Structures are given as structure tokens and as C-alpha cells.
Amino acid sequence: MEGGKSKMKKEDFLNKLRRNTHVQFDMPAVDVKGIQYEDTLKQFIEMTESVGGHVIEAKEGESLDELVKKAYPEAKVFASHLPEITIAQKNPDTVAEANDLNGTDVGIVRGEVGVAENGCIWIPQTMKEKAVLFISEYLVIFLEKEKIVNNMHEAYARIEMDPKYNFGTFISGPSKTADIEQALVMGAQAARGVTVVLV
């Protein structure tokens, strides 16, 4: 109790609403046809680059560790929980708290769905500390080419939450913010740069 008022967690509040909802209605069927592309891979690469990201197509058998080091030769501190990455000094699954990821030069994660329409990549939280997505100076996202879809409608039909964490986010290039004068600043609030590695 703080100030005489009890605090209610979001999930408790939503569960209380669900218990007290006596009449439910099915969602209406809406036939939405999203934009389609002849070449989703080409469109995805173009959109990713247009929003300030970089794209590297990994060659078969190429070392992902070496590929990341080549992309960021000045980086000293890498963070990843992916088993195929052996250069990481920090692991978001084993750090004591999110703050321990501070000072990460390059965070390395895996995306599950890429969207050709806008260059977004769906990244479900599969690690204990999701801060690696936002606290890293630069972010490397591995994405399988076969997981690129045309539009957000197709993407939402495919996304799944990890039941352990129940969180995910779409990321499209480096962080961006713009003021009322429409001056665009990249990297002010999260990753200063994003590299998508297509595997």
C-alpha cells in the first residue's frame, strides 16, 4: 500500500476485466489485402537501407563470428545469447540485471519475421534481459531469407510470443526521432546502427 491505495499489476487488472465480462462478441471477419511484391527479398533490402539499416547476405558456411567482427572492427564488447556466437563477452541470459549490459558495443540477436513493406523485423524476447535490444550501441539481427513476408498483415499472422517472457518487438533500422521542425535524428534513444544479416 502506498498513500492508502493498493497497486494492481496490469495482468491482475486485465484478468479482473475478463472475469467480469459477461457478453463477448466474435471479431468481425475483415478481408484485408496487403501490398504484395514480386521480389520480397529485394524490397526488404531496399526498405532496410532506406530507413538507415545495413544488410549483409551471409555466404554458405561463412563464420557468423567473423562476419560480425568484420562489420564492426572497432567493437570491443559483444553481447548475445545465441549458441553460434562465441565472441560475446556478455550474455543477456546470465547477467544479474539489465544494467550489466551497459557498455555493449554490439548486441547480436535473431529475428523471426522480416517485412518487405517497411523493413521491420519481429524479434520475440527469447533472452532474460531484453535490454540488449535497446542498450547496445549497434545491433546485429540474423534473419532467414525464407522468413521475409510481404506486409504487416502477413507478419502478424506469423508472430509468436515465447510463453516464458511474453514480449516481442518490431525493429526497423536504427532508432529514430524527429522534432517539430522535422529534423531527423538516428540513434538517440537506442541502437545507433542496425545490420541485418540474411542467412
Task: Identify the function of each model-found stretch.
Residues 2-199:
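The feature marks the mature, well-folded catalytic cores of soluble enzymes
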